Each structure stands twice: as C-alpha cells, then as structure tokens.
C-alpha cells in the first residue's frame, strides 16, 4: 500500500537507499564489537569536560541535568532545605545561587505570608482572608481559646489578632486583665456556657451571655415585651428618670461574668450624645426591647448588645425609683391637704374645738421687729390623742402662717413646744 502510488524507478531507488543504511549500520556495530577505534564515537577531551555545579567534579555520565544554565550530576541536583532529589521533579527554583524545591521556595520567599505564623503561602493553598490579611486555614484561630474559625463564624479583630465572638465582646468590655491566662479563660468560658445559655436563633449561633431583666435574676429564653407607656403616663417621672446634661458623659458599670484570680477595677463606658439620644428616644417607646430591637439599636449606635442591655436595665431601675419617689410625694401632699381642710369629725375640727374651750388661757405673741405682721394668738391646751402620731417637725410646717418677703419670719418653735401649744390664726 505504501509504494502503490510510486513509479518503478522511484520504488527501486527507495529500496536501494534502505539497503545501504542497513549495511552501514551493521558495519558500525561489527566495528564496535571488534574494538576498532577508527569507527567509534569521538570521546570528550579532558579540557572540554563539563563541571558539575553541585559537587564541582567532572561530568562523565552519559546523562546529566541542565538547570539555571549550569550542568549537574543527576545525584547532585537537590533542594538545599529539605535535601529532596530534584531529578524526577518537573520544576526547581533558584534564589541567590541556591536550589529549592517548590514547597520550600514558596514557604521562604512567597509574597503572600500568613499573618499568624509569618510563613509563605503557596498559590495552590486554601487561605482565609480578614480585612487585608491572609491566614492559613489552620492558623485562623481565636487568640484566646485557639478555636478554629470557619466560614460563617462571627469573629473580631484587634491589632491583627483574631478573636471569636465570645472573647472579642469580653475584650471590648474589659473583662480580662492583660495578664490573664488563656487556659483559665477557656475553662471559665466552658463553665459559663454550661451554666447560662441564651437562644440566639436569629444570629445562627449560641452565645453564653445571660439576659438581665432589671430585677437581678436570669431570665431564660426570649424576654417578654412589656407594655409601652400610654399617652396618659407620668411624663414628669420619665423626664426625671432620663434627665441628663448633654455636656456630661453618662457611664455605666458592668458585672464580671467570669471569675478572676485578682480583683480588677471595673471598666466604665462613656456614651456619645447621638447614642444617648437614640437610646432615650427608644426608651420612651419601649422600656424592655427584645433581641431583635437590640440588634437594630446596635446597628444604629455602634454599641454591643450587652452594653445596650445594661443601659436599659439601669434606665428601668431609675424610672421605677422616680415613680416611687413621686408617689410618696403625692401621698404627703394629700395628707397635708387633709390636715388643713379636715372634716368636722377630723383632727382639724378637734383642734379648733379644743382651742376654743373656756379652760384655756390665751396669750398674745407679736413680732416686735415687724409691726405689720399679723397677730398670732396661742392657747395653752393639751393636744388631742390623734395628733400625737404626727411628727413635731411636720406639724410645724403645716400650721405656721405665711409671711411677706419684706420681713423675716419669727424664729421657729422647738419640737417640745408643739406638745404644749396650739397655734390658731386671728
């Protein structure tokens, strides 16, 4: 089939050429077998022999390696770090006259270095990126508890150090002193997670932080929303509870969730004016925000949920104290009005009837320094039994007459005189 398209003379010429080549090859092989030097290959002279760049010796082997424009024995081309024989490798790398394998070259001279171990990162290796830093997968761990962080985990960074969410929030709150042992922190965190766990379903994680409802007890699960104050609520109490000078910074204390070997000073957090305004505006609507509301407030104010929980806890306590104080003040005012304008069977009528009894001896007291003052007539009599429970100081404030601003009032009576005298106005 091969010679079918060729003419007769061309076929004979090809066959003759093939026969000549076979005869010449057989002659060379026979000459080599006989040891005839006239037909052997010329040997390399000693002056022109190549030198190995590894050992410096002459290369007399049939095969040798050429790398970095130099000749090498097959046994001499090795990595200077791990001594790996590069004879069967596809690539090798050179730096400052030294030969490296691929792994050692990227480890030592790679442009991308791990921010944790400061070693090189090869181009085929999987990495974790945080901001402008690159980490090995095994190096992307929490600095405190050495927990490996994977895709989807929440973490925080401070000074190029990586923290898990639990320890980063604790670091922001100043829970740990600088000399605190990492092993102790890990043990304390594990114990705290077993004792108190809060449901963070909307965040997709479990976080060991308690929820405080302002009373001092730990509330499990989602907190119950309290009713927001209606339009008829006491606005004066609310304003008194949230009264704060805008020029002053408001501070709050936090409890330490983890036990410490040494007593450390609590850190105090100062709020900015726009943060205070945002929190106060929301407090007027809802005194007890839930986790979703706290998340929205955290995004608006830039504060953590824990800080917001403590602030609302303190605001609720202050609001309740002011309500109790105003209720007590209202009760006192009501009792004063009852004593001054009492019913005929009340203490005031008994007091007036006793003062007008014939057995009393009237005496007149006048202020010599101010003749324009009204005359006060006192009657020596015994005080009824239902007035003995009233304190002398309170009775003095209720029964003394009012004086003009131009003249000073007379000197107050001693508490002992209130049990002997009764004051009436003429």
From Swiss-Prot:
Compositional bias segments (type: Basic and acidic residues): 14-24
GO biological process: anatomical structure formation involved in morphogenesis; axon extension; axon guidance; brain development; cerebral cortex development; dorsal/ventral pattern formation; hair follicle development; maintenance of epithelial cell apical/basal polarity
The name this protein goes by in its record: LIM/homeobox protein Lhx2
Keyword Cytoplasm in record: no
Organism: Rattus norvegicus (Rat)
Region ranges (Disordered): 14-42, 248-268, 326-370
One GO location term (cellular component): nucleus
Subunit structure: Interacts (via LIM domains) with CITED2. Interacts with POU4F2.
């Amino acid at each position: 089939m091969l010679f079918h398209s060729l003419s007769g003379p061309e076929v004979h010429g090809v066959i003759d050429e093939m026969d000549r080549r076979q005869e010449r090859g057989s002659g060379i092989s026979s000459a080599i077998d006989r040891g005839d030097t006239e037909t052997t290959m010329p040997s390399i002279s000693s002056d022109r022999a190549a030198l190995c760049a590894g050992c410096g010796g002459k290369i007399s082997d049939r095969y040798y390696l050429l790398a970095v424009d130099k000749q090498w024995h097959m046994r001499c081309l090795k990595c200077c770090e791990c001594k790996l024989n590069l004879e069967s490798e596809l690539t090798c790398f050179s730096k400052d006259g030294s030969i490296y394998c691929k792994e050692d070259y990227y480890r030592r001279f790679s442009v991308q270095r791990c921010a944790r171990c400061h070693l090189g990162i090869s181009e085929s290796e999987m990495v974790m990126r945080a901001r402008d830093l690159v980490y090995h997968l095994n190096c992307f761990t929490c600095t405190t508890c050495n927990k490996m962080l994977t895709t989807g985990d929440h973490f925080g960074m401070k000074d190029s150090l990586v923290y898990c969410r639990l320890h980063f929030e604790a670091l922001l709150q100043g829970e740990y002193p600088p000399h605190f042992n990492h092993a102790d922190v890990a043990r304390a965190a594990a114990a705290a997670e077993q004792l108190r766990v809060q449901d963070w379903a909307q965040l997709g994680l479990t976080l060991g932080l308690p929820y405080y409802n302002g009373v001092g007890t730990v509330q499990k699960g989602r907190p119950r929303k309290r009713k927001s104050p209606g339009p008829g609520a006491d606005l004066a109490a609310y304003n008194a509870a949230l009264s704060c000078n805008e020029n002053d910074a408001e501070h709050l204390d936090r409890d330490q969730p983890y036990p410490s070997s040494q007593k450390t000073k609590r850190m105090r957090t100062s709020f900015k004016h726009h943060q205070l305004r945002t929190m106060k505006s929301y407090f007027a609507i809802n005194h007890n925000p839930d986790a979703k509301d706290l998340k929205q407030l955290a995004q608006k104010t830039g504060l953590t949920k824990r800080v917001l929980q403590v602030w609302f806890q303190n605001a609720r306590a202050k609001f309740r104290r002011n309500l109790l104080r105003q209720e007590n003040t209202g009760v006192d005012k009501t009792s004063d009005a009852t004593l001054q304008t009492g019913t005929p069977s009340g203490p005031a009528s008994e007091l007036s009837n006793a003062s007008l009894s014939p057995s009393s001896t009237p005496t007149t007291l006048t202020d010599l320094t101010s003749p324009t003052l009204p005359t006060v007539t006192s009657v020596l009599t015994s005080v009824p039994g239902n007035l003995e429970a009233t304190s002398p100081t309170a009775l003095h404030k209720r029964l003394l007459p009012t004086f003009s601003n131009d003249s000073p009032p007379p000197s107050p009576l001693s508490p002992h005189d209130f049990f002997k005298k009764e004051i009436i106005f003429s």
